[in-house]
Amino acid sequence: MGSDFYLRYYVGHKGKFGHEFLEFEFRPDGKLRYANNSNYKNDVMIRKEAYVHKSVMEELKRIIDDSEITKEDDALWPPPDRVGRQELEIVIGDEHISFTTSKIGSLIDVNQSKDPEGLRVFYYLVQDLKCLVFSLIGLHFKIKPI
């Protein structure tokens, strides 16, 4: 698959149900790792791993390229807070970028930020990535990821 691509996304918080989070990563060899931890109603952590075809990896790269996220900077984005944090790390070609911000509830939060254009790019990219991962996990394991 080539070692020029890696993606990791994390969103989570620590609250009355402990450390609840969603995390996934795509490794250069095509391995998709997925973890979803919720202690709500004594749920257990869901961990799944699968290998995806190189065409999926190419589509992932296309989604990232089309989003133009590599042109963004998180300096003016809301910092992580008690509501939670999001992290996105991407290695694509010679570029290595990493973003950290608070959880985003809706586009209202995006529009009220100091960098609505940049945060909007992040927001929609994350929505696309989560949709893709949930579909892959759901289809591969026949489970509901949430």
UniProtKB/Swiss-Prot annotation:
It comes from the Eukaryota. Component of the pre-catalytic, catalytic and post-catalytic spliceosome complexes. Heterodimer with RBM8A. Core component of the mRNA splicing-dependent exon junction complex (EJC); the core complex contains CASC3, EIF4A3, MAGOH or MAGOHB, and RBM8A. Belongs to the mago nashi family. It is found in: Nucleus. GO terms for biological process: mRNA export from nucleus; mRNA splicing, via spliceosome; regulation of mRNA processing; regulation of nuclear-transcribed mRNA catabolic process, nonsense-mediated decay. It comes from Mus musculus (Mouse). Gene3D superfamilies: Mago nashi. This is Protein mago nashi homolog 2. CDD domains: Mago_nashi. Keywords: mRNA processing, mRNA splicing, mRNA transport, Nucleus, RNA-binding, Spliceosome, Transport. Induction: In macrophages, strongly induced by bacterial lipopolysaccharide (LPS). Levels reach a maximum 6 hours after exposure to LPS and are lower, but still much increased after 12 and 24 hours. Ubiquitous. Detected in brain, heart, liver, lung, spleen and testis. GO terms for cellular component: cytosol; exon-exon junction complex; exon-exon junction subcomplex mago-y14; nucleus; U2-type catalytic step 1 spliceosome; U2-type precatalytic spliceosome. PANTHER family: MAGO HOMOLOG, EXON JUNCTION COMPLEX SUBUNIT-RELATED (PTHR12638:SF0), PROTEIN MAGO NASHI HOMOLOG (PTHR12638).
